[in-house]
């Protein structure tokens, strides 16, 4: 392999200035000299003409160089919703087919690994399929593996590692890329620590939180200030990101106030004293899934549905007899008020509040569309309760199902199906029709893959919320009884399945079904991205990382 294929960053100092970085520094300098962008005390953006200057910089950027780096910076800072039109034009100017053909026929091997991997990642993220074969030219033909000389190119390895997380099933070369890049980045840490703690921290952070599987909502604040990233444009857009962070933070606080008042007003916290009372935590799911500030009403409405998933889960896990759970499930399947007459008052209250919430969501769509999603929403909630009931019967009879059977039911009992169906309805995109809703209702792979990620992460440590009692099954328990393996064997199998589920989810988001609008795809990805934070319990059954993020955001 010719040496010219490697990045010009052939040293263990990964962010050595280059012509590309100098270009970004010149743009930043020119922007600062011509703009008086600042933050008002109330957090508003001022003036509008300065926001237009940001857009103008993006419009004038070379789409094959600075434009892509700017998009990367904007996405990392979590302000891509401001520049949707400009980003779309830059991405559309790229041709995945042309990109591949040009690379395939280039016999000089001069492409920089960082640039190629960045372009590959951004095109795939925006629904343009680029074959993973483009990375074959970075392999040693004699050995059949990635050229070990690339280990010197820390910047390129970081970009390759980021790109590898958009792998779909059967792309062995991206599996190899992930292993190769991670191995050599980890090996570089000792040398990096000697002369630049910031750069070492950046590599460690990337290894732990690759962009595609992270939420910029939680990571963007770490980029504020002088950040030693490979992308100099982060410093250009961070002032705007700070303004937006403050503005959106105020919006989130207002939404939490609405959610907590609604939760108090419906009285379930007093009626169901055994159930979790965590409206802020429930809101975090909505905040993470629906990131565009304009979706304020949708976040509040989604949090209401999520609260019932938690409450009903606690009813099935901790409170009721099996006979009562059967009656409750029958009531949710028929939606007849006569079916709840024999239930305790607390379960009657829950049923009525759930029915009111579903009717409210359906009526909103009916007013806009002239048809109601009521039947679909009710059917989805009935499926959830039926899955909860299956688990309750397993526990009552001391039956431990086969691992496959447990996971198939667990995909439904995870509640992901309910959340994503509600999101699909709440987004109210032009693609929302009874036909597309029927399709989403019937558990397409974008839902089952996301649900598998949540169910397996939830079971990985078999932890519960602080102070929560009750009984739950676990994939670990089912696997060990069926196959006789150890806890470590079960967890290794679970991580493999999580990896496979991510590949399936990636495929759905890259090879896009017209039935799924981009905001729905993004919400599905964001749900999967939040899962590790929501289930990363410590030995005290607390979520310290999530609590830290909540404090910084709210």
Swiss-Prot record:
GO terms for biological process: diterpenoid biosynthetic process. CDD domains: Terpene_cyclase_plant_C1. It comes from the Eukaryota. A motif (DDXXD motif) lies at residues 313-317. Mg(2+) 1 binds at residues 313, 317. Pfam families: Terpene_synth, Terpene_synth_C. Keywords: Lyase, Magnesium, Metal-binding. SUPFAM superfamilies: Terpenoid cyclases/Protein prenyltransferases, Terpenoid synthases. InterPro entries: Isoprenoid_synthase_dom_sf, Terpene_cyclase-like_1_C, Terpene_cyclase_plant_C1, Terpene_synth_N, Terpene_synth_N_sf, Terpene_synthase-like, Terpene_synthase_metal-bd, Terpenoid_cyclase/PrenylTrfase. Highly expressed in glandular trichomes. (2E,6E)-farnesyl diphosphate binds at residues 276, 313, 317, 455, 458. Mg(2+) 2 binds at residues 313, 317. PANTHER family: OS04G0344100 PROTEIN-RELATED, S-(+)-LINALOOL SYNTHASE, CHLOROPLASTIC. The Asp-Asp-Xaa-Xaa-Asp/Glu (DDXXD/E) motif is important for the catalytic activity, presumably through binding to Mg(2+). This is (E)-nerolidol synthase TPS18VF. It comes from Cannabis sativa. The lineage of its organism: Eukaryota, Viridiplantae, Streptophyta, Embryophyta, Tracheophyta.
């Amino acid at each position: 392999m010719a040496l010219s294929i490697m990045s010009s960053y052939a040293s263990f100092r990964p962010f050595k200035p280059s012509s590309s970085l100098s270009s970004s520094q010149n743009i930043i300098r020119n922007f600062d000299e011509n703009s008086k962008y600042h933050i008002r005390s109330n957090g508003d953006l001022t003036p509008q003409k300065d926001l237009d200057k940001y857009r103008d910089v993006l419009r004038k950027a070379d789409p094959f160089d600075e434009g892509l780096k700017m998009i990367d910076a904007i996405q990392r800072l979590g302000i891509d919703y401001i520049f949707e039109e400009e980003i779309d034009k830059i991405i559309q100017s790229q041709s995945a087919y042309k990109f591949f053909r040009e690379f395939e026929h280039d016999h000089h091997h001069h492409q920089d690994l960082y640039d190629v991997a960045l372009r590959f990642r951004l095109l795939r993220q925006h629904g343009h399929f680029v074959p993973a074969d483009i990375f074959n030219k970075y392999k040693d033909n004699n050995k059949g593996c990635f050229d070990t000389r690339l280990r010197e190119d820390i910047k390129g390895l970081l970009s390759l590692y980021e790109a590898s997380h958009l792998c779909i099933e059967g792309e062995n070369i991206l599996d190899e890329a992930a292993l190769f890049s991670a191995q050599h980045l980890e090996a570089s840490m000792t040398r990096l620590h000697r002369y630049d703690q910031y750069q070492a921290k950046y590599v460690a952070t990337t290894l732990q939180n690759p962009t595609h599987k992270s939420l910029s909502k939680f990571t963007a604040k770490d980029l504020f200030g002088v950040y030693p990233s490979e992308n100099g444009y982060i410093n250009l857009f961070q002032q705007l990101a700070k303004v937006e962070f403050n503005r959106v933070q105020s919006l989130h606080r207002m939404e939490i106030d609405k959610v907590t008042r609604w939760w108090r007003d419906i009285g379930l916290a007093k009626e169901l004293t055994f159930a979790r009372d965590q409206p802020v935590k429930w809101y975090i799911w909505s905040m993470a899934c629906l990131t565009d500030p304009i979706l304020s009403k949708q976040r509040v409405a989604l949090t209401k549905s999520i609260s019932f998933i938690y409450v009903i889960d606690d009813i099935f896990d901790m409170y009721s007899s099996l006979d009562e759970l059967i009656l409750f499930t029958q009531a949710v399947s028929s939606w007849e008020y006569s079916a709840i007459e024999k239930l305790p008052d607390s379960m009657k209250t829950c049923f009525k509040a759930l029915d009111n919430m579903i009717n409210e969501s359906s009526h909103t769509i009916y007013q806009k569309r002239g048809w109601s999603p009521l039947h679909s929403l009710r059917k989805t909630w009935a499926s959830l309760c039926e899955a909860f009931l299956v688990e309750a019967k397993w526990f009552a009879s001391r039956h431990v199902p086969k691992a496959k059977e447990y996971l198939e039911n667990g995909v439904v009992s995870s509640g992901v199906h309910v959340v994503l169906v509600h999101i699909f309805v709440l987004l109210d995109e032009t693609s929302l029709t009874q036909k597309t809703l029927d399709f989403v209702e019937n558990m397409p792979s974008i839902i089952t893959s996301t649900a598998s990620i949540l169910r397996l992460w939830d079971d990985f440590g078999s932890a519960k919320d602080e102070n929560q009692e009750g009984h739950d099954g676990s994939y670990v328990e089912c696997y060990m009884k069926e196959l006789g393996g150890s806890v470590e064997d079960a967890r290794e199998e679970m991580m493999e399945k999580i990896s496979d589920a991510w590949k399936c989810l990636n495929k759905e988001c890259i090879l896009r079904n017209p039935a799924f609008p981009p905001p729905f795809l993004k919400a599905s990805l964001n749900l999967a991205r939040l899962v590790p934070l929501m289930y990363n319990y410590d030995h005290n059954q607390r979520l310290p990382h999530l609590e830290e993020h909540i404090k910084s955001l709210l």
